[in-house]
UniProtKB/Swiss-Prot annotation:
Residues 3-89 form the Acylphosphatase-like domain. This is Acylphosphatase. It comes from Thermotoga maritima (strain ATCC 43589 / DSM 3109 / JCM 10099 / NBRC 100826 / MSB8). GO terms for molecular function: acylphosphatase activity. Pfam families: Acylphosphatase.
Length: 90
């Protein structure tokens, strides 16, 4: 089990990005959460096996049709044992 902190930048708010991310995560068995950030980016904490996370990142980098992803930064982190993938609101 690996865990990643992912920040996605570009036109990623107001375009269905969080719902897209949750759908992709659930289809791949990835756990964690996604949330909008005050700076206009989207933050994702994702946990899963290496292959699932690789596929997840590939899809997130594309985003939904209305999104324009300009940058994706990824950092490994410690798994926290999430049992589902959710959208967090602040």
């Amino acid at each position: 089990m690996k865990a990643l902190k992912i920040r996605v930048e570009g036109i990623v708010q107001g375009v269905g990005f969080r719902y897209f991310t949750r759908r992709v995560a659930k289809s791949l068995g990835v756990k964690g959460y996604v949330m909008n950030m005050d700076d206009g980016s989207v933050f994702i904490h994702a946990e899963g096996d290496e292959n699932a996370l690789r596929r997840f990142l590939n899809e997130v980098a594309k985003g939904p049709p209305a999104a324009v992803v300009t940058n994706v930064s990824v950092e490994e982190t410690t798994p926290e044992g999430y049992e589902d993938f959710t959208i967090k609101y602040y």
